[in-house]
Amino acid sequence: MKTTKLLIPTQKEVPNDAQIISHQLMIRAGLISKLASGLYSYLPMGVRVLHKVENIIRQEMNKSGAQEVFMPVVQPAELWKTSGRWDKYGTELLRFTDRHQREFCLGPTHEEVITHLAAQYLRSYKQLPMNFYQIQTKFRDEIRPRFGVMRSREFIMKDAYSFHLDQYSLQQTYDVMYQTYCNIFDRLSLDYHAVLADSGSIGGDASHEFHVLAESGEDTICFSDESNYAANIEKVSFLKQEKTCKSTLTEERVLTKKKNSIEEVAEFLNVNKSDCVKILIIKTKDGFKALALRGDHELNEIKAHNLFGNFEFAIDDEIKNLDLKKGFIGIKDLDIDLIVDYSASVLCDFVCGANEWDYHLMSVNWQGIEFVDADLRSAVEGDYSPDGKGKLIIKRGIEVGHIFQLGTKYSSAMKVNVIGESGKAITTTMGCYGIGVTRIIAASIEQNYDDKGIIFPQAIAPFQVVIVPINYNKSTRVKALSDKLYQQFIGAGIEVLLDDRKERAGIMFADSELLGIPHRMVISDTHADNGNVEYKARDKIDKMQMKFDDALSFIQFKL
């Protein structure tokens, strides 16, 4: 392909609304164009990258034995009402009414549609297991679309759904899909971790997320420095610890006037935050609860939700009505249930509030205090790994894939039953497997860039090689050699871009680097005099000269 025949609207300026590097570079490199908030058009270079990502996914999914289907984006409300999600899904579900006053939605996911389809055509246990996938547009009416295609309203996903006779069969397919996802992300050259995860609004049992490591990631993931353990911070669990407190100190009431935060109290009393206990008051369906955590730990709200159901933090007036002093709440004289995090329950001679304005207690212990201990906190860097091997490292991650064991949540609601070997109807059990196709492009850029632009992995670069001829439109020798090399590459099946524009060399170099094309060949009159071409890899600083006749074999070796 020649540059003059392509739309590549590169730009120097960083868009004002582009906060993260992938958004900035995708706009600047002319991969995408913003239509409205959370809506983007893919331009020719972006489409080339998108298709390469899709092709890798499609190849690996086909290899796994999954069958490709293609389902409508527009979905009837009846299906969502049958599954129970029409009211539960919330405002992200874009609903509308057609001219006949029938309700529909734009699909953010396709569990309802695939189960409706399966209920029509899966009749016998002999047909199972079956795994269907599609690569399709989704729509979620995000309240705050941001970060370009990372969190847009319209996006492309690969979603797959498997149907099984029993849990054993589901586990087999789940394991196959886990490995398939690893194969996909390996081929995409992503630095990723598969982590234990929460099932979220889709629901279900076992669940893994696949996260690309990047500082711009919205999720926090934890992994061991010595083992394969990895989990979303929401899912890192801690075991109950043995209590070994043998205190010989006397409890002391101290004046801490106007010092009502852990940081202020610890500094004032010259103690570590880890030697303090803080109390949070929450409101649940069963009334108010007091949660005690170590001063340097934070409440994991997912764990709290799993323990208490929906809850809210108590507001100032509610705390006052409980006869508690905000900022000075302690573990004594509480008239509400006290739940203590495991790590706080083993503290000895600690600091906590005195339930009295401007006072704290020192050398406090748990003897005589009625409480229940539980796993309440979020992990912190340096915690021992839950598998007992090594310590936890905490990084930011971009979720690019998620696999679930759904069980019978949807197949039961949608009546996806088959006749078993005994002749009786059996409700199928399901798995669900998603990959954010468009998000992968942004995630890859977040890991592969420099101050000049994108450094695409070879597998998804828009072109494999760019030829940059100096004075292509002025020097007949340069034009002849460039055209010859261009034809050689095309003949060898190499995806090559020839920059035939009437531009300065600096502009052509800058654009090729911005676009992230892995290999660059430069031809000038000087090179022609010596029968050479100049080669530079996008991810390297050094350049090298080689004979023109060796250029094709050299690139073939690199590819």
Curated annotation (Swiss-Prot):
Catalytic activity, EC: 6.1.1.15
Domain of life: Bacteria
A Pfam family reported for this protein in Swiss-Prot or TrEMBL: tRNA-synt_2b
Catalytic activity: tRNA(Pro) + L-proline + ATP = L-prolyl-tRNA(Pro) + AMP + diphosphate
InterPro entries from the UniProt entry: aa-tRNA-synt_IIb, aa-tRNA-synth_II, aa-tRNA-synth_II/BPL/LPL, Anticodon-bd, Anticodon-bd_dom_sf, Pro-tRNA-ligase_IIa, Pro-tRNA-synth_IIa_bac-type, Pro-tRNA-Synthase_IIa_type1
Matches recorded under NCBIfam families: PRK09194.1, proS_fam_II
Name of the featured protein: Proline--tRNA ligase
Species for this entry: Ruthia magnifica subsp. Calyptogena magnifica
